[in-house]
């Protein structure tokens, strides 16, 4: 997790993002104690993060490394001394939230470029993905740094059942291999005591296959440090059925008859980019229920 780290939060408060009032930023609204104070990627943490990556690659060994998935990377309305200085160097208005969010997007793109170059200098064949819980037009400029796309979307965990149908129909037009990502949990990440019912998990995975995506079912290691047999029995049962369908789902391209322009492209710069507009949700529902094959596009797509 790139921008959440409990140890960093405790030991290096000078690396944390702060809002316009000088308060640490907690985007999750979780009561203390927690580890959700967001880290600023403009701070000394960036070198610490690169040192961690280098140590990990050296310990694992390049020959054993498939790829690196970096989680929790998103725009933050940060007004720390590092961001203020960089904005001033670019002639940007540090008192404007719109300008701060515009700079946050620029800085995040620049961070991804630097980290991808750093990783590939040591592990040229490693796959790379930066997860911000959503794949949409706002992140499009940085997708050149991704080897593939992973669409995190837990229907019962905050994303809802409308998120994946819309996002996948946009992401499949970006020229990257695409994987759908759900979880084995009944609700959200970290819901350790629960298992999603098999029918729901099958629906999610079969939906991934139907839109041309691979399947990923996420888990987290229980604090006891032992994998849950029940979880992997569940996942195994679902993947057994997925395996039977895989020969028909490789190297596929959707044959669509309708294109819908996403309003995300035109959101205000200070708007949250992971929230789908009601108009898009309604359009996707109607077209799905009528049985049409369609894509979600932006204005730059052919």
Sequence positions of predicted segments:
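Contiguous N-terminal and early-domain "leader" segments and peripheral loops that mark the onset or edge
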Residues: 1-2, 258
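Active-site-adjacent "subsite" loops/lids of carbohydrate-active enzymes
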Residues: 2-60, 98-101, 112-113, 300
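Carbohydrate-binding surfaces of carbohydrate-active enzymes
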Residues: 97-137, 142-302
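Active-site neighborhood of glycoside hydrolase catalytic domains
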Residues: 41-145
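Aromatic- and acidic-residue-enriched segments that line the glycan-binding/catalytic groove
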Residues: 2-32, 70-95, 146, 275
